């Protein structure tokens, strides 16, 4: 019986194929290489045990702070900046003061804008950070992110989107607000949606978009043991072009509280006919600032009901249904502050009455920023064909 089985052509082909697979496995270096073939590429090797200071190499940047604008006709910046250092140190203590952050970033212009002086940047990237009552986290992010991005030789601007009031936090809706307001300023090439408590650990993780589809950038967080928690995870830090953002109708507006919106967004990407790309695990390293659970950002009890409806609701819930009241647009020395009233959860309890800003929260922080603000210089209005993204609020 065994002999007849071995004489069958399909059995012989199976045996030959198995032998070839084993030979390939051994020639490529065993399990690690095989996993790189059939899993996700681990990418180049970096030594994270000897990180560089995040302010390394900034002295090599051309151009003096406050000098004349760069002349026209500059060559394009290199595709990969020669100023990159790889792994950088991330420290959560002490929390730097605003004065220290401003002093260490003299090339940053009002509104948190930067443009390299010696070459024409290949990408104009808007960093959009949803925020409420996380001042220490915000200072750590600003201290860390400005030099990180300057070494990449990008033109960039940082937008911090404050949710006014005491209602339930809505991260995804704040990101929609940030995208719309950022595109009123400039025709950005790339939109980086960035949680305030995540600090990048490797400047080879370029803050640029992929024209082929949305990028999920925070692929290896210390919170998850520097690995992706599950294949469709799209949380933390992501990057989309304005066209990609509009194609998926932006982010959902109905997720009040913690959880669910990341999975909804990943589903939108698929339903819009796009695919998620990621940097190698060895590059997309992030450290999360430790914090307790936020009051007003409790677990969303409706998230699973909303996820079930995503396939039918994504074309109606997003940028085309976004409503909010813009309360403030302020140019600080380190970022553009956008304060918006985005309403309250229609399914939850009514928000308690009180000041628009939680006690001890962003109001004092913002006032300190404004006291240090240089004279405001309004940016040019975009003439890009993103009318739907820049529509009225």
From Swiss-Prot:
Entry binding sites for UDP-alpha-D-galactose: 130-134, 169-171, 196-197, 226, 258, 291-293
Cell compartment(s), UniProt: Golgi apparatus, Golgi stack membrane
Binding positions (Mn(2+)): 197, 291
EC number: 2.4.1.-, 2.4.1.38, 2.4.1.90, 2.4.1.275
Substrates-to-products reaction catalysed: an N-acetyl-beta-D-glucosaminyl derivative + UDP-alpha-D-galactose = a beta-D-galactosyl-(1->4)-N-acetyl-beta-D-glucosaminyl derivative + UDP + H(+); N-acetyl-D-glucosamine + UDP-alpha-D-galactose = beta-D-galactosyl-(1->4)-N-acetyl-D-glucosamine + UDP + H(+); a beta-D-GlcNAc-(1->3)-beta-D-Gal-(1->4)-beta-D-Glc-(1<->1)-Cer(d18:1(4E)) + UDP-alpha-D-galactose = a neolactoside nLc4Cer(d18:1(4E)) + UDP + H(+); a beta-D-glucosylceramide + UDP-alpha-D-galactose = a beta-D-galactosyl-(1->4)-beta-D-glucosyl-(1<->1)-ceramide + UDP + H(+)
InterPro entries to which the protein is assigned, alphabetical: Galactosyl_T, Galactosyl_T_C, Galactosyl_T_N, Nucleotide-diphossugar_trans
Annotated region described as Disordered, given as residue ranges: 339-393
Keyword entries, A-Z: Disulfide bond, Glycoprotein, Glycosyltransferase, Golgi apparatus, Lipid metabolism, Manganese, Membrane, Metal-binding, Signal-anchor, Transferase, Transmembrane, Transmembrane helix
Keyword Aminoacyl-tRNA synthetase in record: no
Transmembrane segments: 11-31
Gene Ontology cellular-component annotations: cytosol; extracellular exosome; Golgi apparatus; Golgi cisterna membrane; Golgi membrane
Binding sites annotated in the UniProt record for N-acetyl-D-glucosamine: 260-263, 303
Cofactor(s) the record lists: Mn(2+)
Regions of this protein lying in the Lumenal compartment: 32-393
Residues in the Cytoplasmic compartment per record: 1-10
One Gene Ontology term of the molecular function aspect: galactosyltransferase activity
Membrane topology: Single-pass type II membrane protein
A Gene Ontology BP annotation from the UniProt entry: protein glycosylation
Pathway where it operates: Protein modification; protein glycosylation
Residue positions the entry lists as glycosylated: 57, 166, 337, 385
Any coiled-coil regions, as ranges: none
UniProt main location, coarse: Golgi
UniProt note on tissues of expression: Found in various tissues. Highest expression in placenta, prostate, testis, ovary, intestine and muscle, and in fetal brain.
Family per record: Belongs to the glycosyltransferase 7 family.
Role according to the record: Responsible for the synthesis of complex-type N-linked oligosaccharides in many glycoproteins as well as the carbohydrate moieties of glycolipids.
Name of the molecule in the record: Beta-1,4-galactosyltransferase 3
Organism: Homo sapiens (Human)
This protein's encoding gene: B4GALT3
